[in-house]
A protein has these predicted regions:
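Structural microenvironment flanking redox-active thiols in thiol-disulfide oxidoreductases
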Residues: 71-110, 122-125
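A short beta-strand-turn-helix
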Residues: 34-56
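Bacterial N-terminal signal peptides that target proteins for export
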Residues: 1-9
Length: 182
């Protein structure tokens, strides 16, 4: 009995330690989506196309609200929102959680600073090939920076939440510097 449990534990540790590959690559068109979302505890309809009309968008997928890694990541995005906004970008988190759970999460973990979207039918998760391999009912931890033209600028995939915010900010700064001055 111990050997199968030990093997399962080792496999789960390995799955967390290894980075995953983001499905969409730079230059690819990001799938458009409209989904229920929550901000500051209030629900609304979120449209990626509408958000992109105002500037670049960070779309980050996360496995489950109120789990330690997802709460850490949401808190880090919340703390960094002034930096994203100063660079003209918005952020949306996407998970397969139901909208009621995400309404609470939008207040508690996201500090009412950015919306989180419910993809309970896994339509967006599948379109972005962002299903967690070991648990397909959950989203993987993948972040994308999408330009106003709908093309992927950068992506970062790792189950470890630590570098998603800094990686997206660095990519956003680099993209912003490459834009012609108006």
């Amino acid at each position: 009995m111990r050997t199968p449990l030990a093997a399962l534990f080792a496999l789960s540790v390995l799955a967390v330690a290894l980075p995953v590959a983001a499905a969409l690559k730079a230059g690819q068109r990001a799938p458009n989506f409209s989904v229920p979302a929550a901000l500051a505890g209030k629900t609304f309809g979120y449209s990626l196309a509408a958000a992109l009309s105002r500037g670049p968008v960070v779309v980050y997928f996360f496995p489950a609200a109120f789990t330690s890694g997802c709460s850490i990541e949401a808190h880090e995005f919340a703390e960094a929102m002034p930096k994203f906004e100063s660079l003209g970008a918005s952020v949306i988190g996407v998970s397969t959680d139901d909208i009621d759970t995400l309404a609470r999460f939008s207040v508690e973990a996201c500090q009412s600073r950015f919306p989180v979207a419910s993809d309970s039918g896994k339509v967006v998760v599948k379109a972005y090939d962002a299903q967690l391999a070991i648990r397909p009912d959950y989203a993987d931890r993948i972040s994308y920076l999408i330009g106003p033209d709908g093309a992927v600028i950068a992506s970062y995939a790792s189950l470890n939440p630590d570098k998603h915010v800094e990686t997206m900010l660095a990519a956003l700064r680099e993209w912003r510097q490459a834009q012609p001055r108006k």
